[in-house]
Amino acid sequence: MPNPSQQKLPDLASTRKLQGLLAVGHLANDWSPAAIWLLAPAIGLAFDLQPSQIGLLITLHSFGAALAYLPAGILSDRMQRPGKLLLFTFWWVGLGYFLASFAQNFWVLATVLAMAGMGDAAWHPIATGALARRFPTRKGLALGIHAVGGTLAEVFSPLVVGILLSVMEWRSALQLSILPPLIMGVVFYKFRNAIPISTTSSISKVDLVRLLRSWTTPKGLALITAITTYNMALIALMTISPLFVQRELGYSTSEAGLFFALAMLIGATGQPLVGRWSDRIGRRRVFICGLAIAGACALLATGFPQQGWTAGVLIAAMAILVFVRSSVLAMAVDFSRQREATTLGFIFALMDGVGALGGVTAGLVGNFEL
């Protein structure tokens, strides 16, 4: 007699309900990590940190996440039912960031935030791997819809935190930010066995060697360079822009939150459209076009830093880089053509590991300019 969870599976996996469930889960899981973008300047004030130390805090936060991506992807490809792993990530995130709110110095806080970020990181290759398997011909669109959830977290979480920081200190604001993942951790329990199973055999050492060889070819190395450079630029902008608009343009914390939220909201709405566009005309064309336009916007902002439209240009630069994120992930899966979760785990590790150096680099520049 079939398992009840198996009877539910086709109905969930064959409709948009799967995309909706994973997008909402993505939003909840990313809520606490996204709060750090606006909490970081407040933490800097509380701990009397330099801009470079604020950048280092965000870099270590991202680096901790990078350590979890690849193991999570490999584990997902070894397990037929990834839903239980996804359920576990909500509780890891909630409890991890709650503990971080009690840190009394920079290094304890950085360490606990890095460990908490691992829980959120584990969600990404597992969920996106399931979507890439379920929608093989529409990866750009499917990953774009999933990405909307995470980007909406980066819209509303900093916005809410910016408001909270005007009435409370950063520890209380961080503690309130754990509510979405904990609530979703309860809701998701019902769906833990309804995530599409993997029909391929468990990943082996031979598979890993084959995957590694494909990424060490000249084409693979060029793609790695492009992806890490892209994420360094995005993280650098996301790190320094809230600090810049507060120190140079005189924004309050709530105004900085609104500025950041607007950039992420514009980026979120564009991801499914740009992902679908890349399904039709090709990933590379979309990627190159997006980077060129975003780079031009960033140069305009640095060339005229005191102009009234500077914030608008920075919003455009961040939004455009967010636009192409789903296309970047789909481009990586198209290249490897195997083991979607492991491939995406590898790419996420590159983006948040090597790419996170953009945060500390931006902070070092801020030491001299802000």
PLM regions: where:
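Juxtamembrane intracellular "pre-TM" segments in multi-pass secondary transporters
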Residues: 2-13, 195-224
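Extracytoplasmic gate region of multi-pass secondary transporters
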Residues: 36-37, 219-268
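Central cavity-lining transmembrane alpha-helices of secondary-active solute carriers
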Residues: 59-74, 261-273
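Conserved MFS/SLC helix-loop-helix module at the cytosolic interface between two early adjacent transmembrane helices
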Residues: 67-104, 278-284
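Cytoplasmic helix-loop-helix junction between adjacent transmembrane helices
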Residues: 112-150
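C-terminal membrane-cytosol helix-exit motif in multi-pass small-molecule transporters
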Residues: 178-200
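C-terminal transmembrane helical hairpin of 12-TM major facilitator-type secondary transporters
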Residues: 281-331
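A late C-terminal transmembrane helix in Major Facilitator Superfamily
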Residues: 338-368
